[in-house]
Amino acid sequence: MNGMNSIHLQQTLPQVFADRNSVTSDVWHQDLIFRKGEMYLIEAASGTGKSSLCSYIYGYRNDYQGIINFDETNIKAYSVKQWVDLRKHSLSMLFQDLRIFTELTALENVQLKNNLTGYKKKKEVLAYFEQLGIADKINVKVGKLSFGQQQR
């Protein structure tokens, strides 16, 4: 599977919102395209579907109306193998509960995923730690880091 270049939401709406008379949103019931290499901020009140959107895009849930395409393919048509390949090479998600191993160092936690994908060289990984302002924490066990440091 080649790298994904765009995520296209077409009139997408969580099923839980379907029975509401009106949903005012910059995301739901819109035609949106998120393009590779661009940065986007989705900011909204609690309970408006931010986590749901991430779960749909990551393939964890499909309880929505409308269409979500990766490039030109409807994601509801993806097989388990295709989802695995996407998550290895094109998608990554920072979960709210972090899903890290507190007994491993920050670098070891990052290397776990990177060893599966072979996506970044160690030099590149170390550069990210530097950019995030936590280069001095690479050999610290994650359980000893602040929550903000763990998120980075």
Regions found by a protein language model. Give the residues of each.
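Conserved ABC ATPase signature
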Residues: 141-150
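ABC ATPase NBD coupling module
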Residues: 75-92
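Conserved ABC ATPase "signature" region
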Residues: 74, 122-137
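Conserved catalytic motifs of ABC-family nucleotide-binding domains
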Residues: 93-108, 116
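ABC-type ATPase nucleotide-binding domains, specifically the catalytic core motifs of the NBD
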Residues: 108-123, 131
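Conserved ABC transporter NBD signature motif
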Residues: 66-75
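Helix-to-loop junction immediately C-terminal to a conserved catalytic motif
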Residues: 58
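A short, flexible loop at the N-terminus of ABC-type nucleotide-binding domains that lies
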Residues: 1-33
